[in-house]
Swiss-Prot record:
Pfam families reported for this sequence: SurE
Protein name per its UniProtKB record: 5'-nucleotidase SurE
Catalytically driven reaction(s): a ribonucleoside 5'-phosphate + H2O = a ribonucleoside + phosphate
Gene: surE
Family of this protein: Belongs to the SurE nucleotidase family.
Taxonomic lineage: Bacteria, Pseudomonadati, Pseudomonadota, Alphaproteobacteria, Hyphomicrobiales
Keywords: Cytoplasm, Hydrolase, Metal-binding, Nucleotide-binding
Amino acid sequence: MRILVTNDDGIHAPGLKVLEEIARELSDDVWVVAPETDQSGVSHSLSLNDPLRLRRVAETRFAVKGTPSDCVIMGVRHILKERGPDLVLSGVNRGQNVAEDVTYSGTVAGAMEGTILGVRSIALSQAYGVGGRANVKWHTAAEHGARTIRRILEAGIEPGILVNVNFPDCEPEAVEGIAVVAQGMRNQQLLAIDERLDGRGNPYFWLAFAKARFEPGHGTDLKAIAENRIAVTPLRLDLTDEPTLTRFAQVFG
């Protein structure tokens, strides 16, 4: 099995190294094509107005000056054009990609692009908690990653579907199994604008989340990782809402 690995945190990210190790538990034919720099939050964007610069880091490792989607396209259509990958793995992201995160996530977009190109694709992220970005439990993803991927592949991934995996913020032995769950939704009232002043008194702004009690919905990715379970969520490329489609057809028909 030929595996293409990408991410959105960049070619030097620790999570990418973790995912390479996970991939090598599954296959000895692993290729890495990742962004030259951190592309967190770029979603499914493409570099249409800038050229893509490709740098060979090692025999089967490449860095691209571009987005995660650019990287997957370069991997499938250029680097591996003679024989494409059988699986695209994107991650392991520093931080969870659950609920509406998936619409912003470059990690999820890497898997989405693989799906568009007809390759089975899985996005993987490692949640972190109060310890912050400096205390990510990468060993949890490393311990459970290959086993989780194997089970997903055994279950089968249909065309047009990608799989989003989130590992909880706990020690590997504290993981309470795998939960197949829906995409959740946060309380958007917690999203705030943090206004500050620079040294010259000019305002600048950060997006921030207010700290408040929030109860995630049952059967969601948010709830699963809160309960120390690995959240596995199938997502689809077709964003059509069928009930509304039917209702609109009756109204406008």
